[in-house]
From Swiss-Prot:
Keywords: Chloroplast, Plastid, Ribonucleoprotein, Ribosomal protein, RNA-binding, rRNA-binding
GO biological process: translation
GO cellular component: chloroplast; ribonucleoprotein complex; ribosome
Gene3D superfamilies: 2.30.30.30
Protein name: Large ribosomal subunit protein uL24c
InterPro entries referenced in this protein's UniProt entry, alphabetically: KOW (IPR005824), Rib_uL2_dom2 (IPR014722), Ribosomal_uL24 (IPR003256), Ribosomal_uL24_CS (IPR005825), Ribosomal_uL24_KOW (IPR041988), Translation_prot_SH3-like_sf (IPR008991)
Subunit note: Part of the 50S ribosomal subunit.
Role, per record: One of two assembly initiator proteins, it binds directly to the 5'-end of the 23S rRNA, where it nucleates assembly of the 50S subunit.
Subcellular location: Plastid, Chloroplast
Molecular-function annotations in GO: rRNA binding; structural constituent of ribosome
Major site of localization recorded for this protein: plastid
Species the sequence originates in: Porphyra purpurea (Red seaweed)
Gene: rpl24
Similarity field: Belongs to the universal ribosomal protein uL24 family.
Length: 95
């Protein structure tokens, strides 16, 4: 296989840690702050508590009754769209 066809699978370093307080830079949740609850290193994405909520409807297929549940979950955000936030100084910075 040619080296040009092989996808570069080197994981980029994410500068955040689980538990860090971050501010969202873009999207519908812009300027909101939240705590990182998970980091996905393979795709350089983070999951922030209470931010980027998505809704999913699911049906219980084992029963014949068509009652379902609506669940909310936090979807991942790319690490370039978040910035560390300092509550002490009330500012956000990339470093």
């Amino acid at each position: 296989m040619k080296s040009s066809l092989i996808k570069n699978t080197v994981n980029k370093k994410v500068k955040f840690k689980k538990g860090d307080l971050v501010q969202i830079l873009s999207g519908s949740d812009k300027k909101k702050t939240g705590e990182i609850i998970a980091i996905i290193h393979k795709t350089s994405k983070v999951i922030v508590k209470g931010i980027n909520l998505k809704v999913e409807a699911s049906k219980d297929l084992s029963k014949k009754v068509e009652t379902g549940e609506i669940t909310k979950f936090e979807a991942p955000i790319h690490s370039s769209n978040v910035m560390l936030f300092s509550q002490k100084n009330n500012i956000s910075s990339r470093f």
